[in-house]
Amino acid sequence: MTSPATELLKTPLFDLHVALGARMVPFAGYSMPVQYPDGLIAEHKHTRASASLFDVSHMGQLRLVGSDAAAAFETLMPVDVIGLGVGKQRYGLLLNDEGGIMDDLMFVNTGDDLFVIVNGACKAADIAHIQNRIGQRCRVELMPDWALLALQGPQAVDALARLAPGVKKLVFMTGGAFDW
């Protein structure tokens, strides 16, 4: 929660949201759009029938770089990180020092590094934990200025394929970089 004295952070798409008439609300320390002029029901129906773009830039994005990155990251969660193939994505649970669950996260093996996405509400604590526990074994690169978008709906692949045709080859829990 954000105190009145704390200024809300803005995603890279903040100005676009405001220009499109979004109603902005505090969420995870950011000013985030909660709805647009057409209303929630229209937005929901559009997403279910076509595809909608969601700004999830409040979530934490980081890269784990180095030859020991996968082995180091695997010490923080009860999932196989070392064996994750290039272009494959995995859901994981970030554990505290006692083995309790701190948070959940997603990561993908890009071939050069691990790209990690942590939840916005716990971003600072998650990133600090990762840096403190494995920062000496691999480089932890934060990406605070990057936007993160979620494209959802039955027409999502077709919509994105118009910009980056290679995305059609992706299946569930895979990822990749595409030129457009």
Feature-to-residue mapping (PLM):
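Basic, glycine/lysine-rich polyanion-binding surfaces/domains
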Residues: 1-180
